[in-house]
Amino acid sequence: MKRTYQPKKRHLQRVHGFRKRMSTANGRKVLARRRAKGRKVLAA
C-alpha cells in the first residue's frame, strides 16, 4: 500500500502559500495572528 502523503511543492504553495493567504480577508487574519504570536515562518 502506498503512503497517503505524496508531497508536491506547487500544491503546497497554492494551498498554503503566502500569496494565497494574502488573497482573502480570512487569510490575512491568519497572517496577522501568526505575526502577533511571533511566528518566524508566516506561511508555507
Curated annotation (Swiss-Prot):
Disulfide bonds: none
Biased composition (Basic residues): 1-22
Signal sequence segment: none
Gene3D superfamilies: 1.10.287.3980
GO biological process terms, semicolon-separated: translation
UniProt key word Thylakoid: no
GO cellular component: ribonucleoprotein complex; ribosome
Organism taxonomic ancestry: Bacteria, Bacillati, Bacillota, Bacilli, Lactobacillales
Molecular function as annotated in GO: structural constituent of ribosome
Chain positions covered by the region annotation Disordered: 1-25
Similarity-based family: Belongs to the bacterial ribosomal protein bL34 family.
Xref: PANTHER family: LARGE RIBOSOMAL SUBUNIT PROTEIN BL34M, MITOCHONDRIAL RIBOSOMAL PROTEIN 34 FAMILY MEMBER
Record key words, sorted: Ribonucleoprotein, Ribosomal protein
Protein name, entry field: Large ribosomal subunit protein bL34
Organism: Oenococcus oeni (strain ATCC BAA-331 / PSU-1)
Pfam family, one: Ribosomal_L34
Ribonucleoprotein in keyword set: yes
